[in-house]
Amino acid sequence: MPTLTLKGTYMKRNILNIVNFLRGTEPRTDTDIHKPFLEQLRLMKENNLRGTFLLQYDALTDPFYTDILKELPPEQFEIGVWFEVVESLCAPFGVEWKGRWSWDYWSEFSFTGAYTFDVREKMADKLFHDFKEVFGYYPRSLGAWCLDAHSIAYISEKYDVDAY
């Protein structure tokens, strides 16, 4: 999109960031979910494209993803978190998982707004703690199809996330 400069002329800005979110399970299809990840990674490397990979909790605990992601050059690839709730993120807090699979696309199971403020904070802390355990730092980027204001405020203040 052209940008108007102070002198009244236009300059062209080219900004592109490819964002891929990674899940540990996909119950809606029989597709091997590792294959699309490997293909996305291949295409980004082949075309020298920068991008971000956001890991859902079940992907964060999958060494297939994390072993590959840890080896990527940080100047080309950013690693962050995808904050949808999965069964394995509920278990440590005694929260009953009511989804049909270990990840369920229905909002009353997978979106943070379905849980109390206290549970949302605990889930965020678990997600960020475990990310740091794997990668050695807290993520700066976070994504979700739907994220509530309380979780955004909590995460922004505690973990200094700067990209949603």
Protein language model annotation of sequence segments:
Residues 2-140, 146-164:
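Catalytic alpha-helical scaffold of carbohydrate-active enzymes acting on polysaccharides/glycoconjugates
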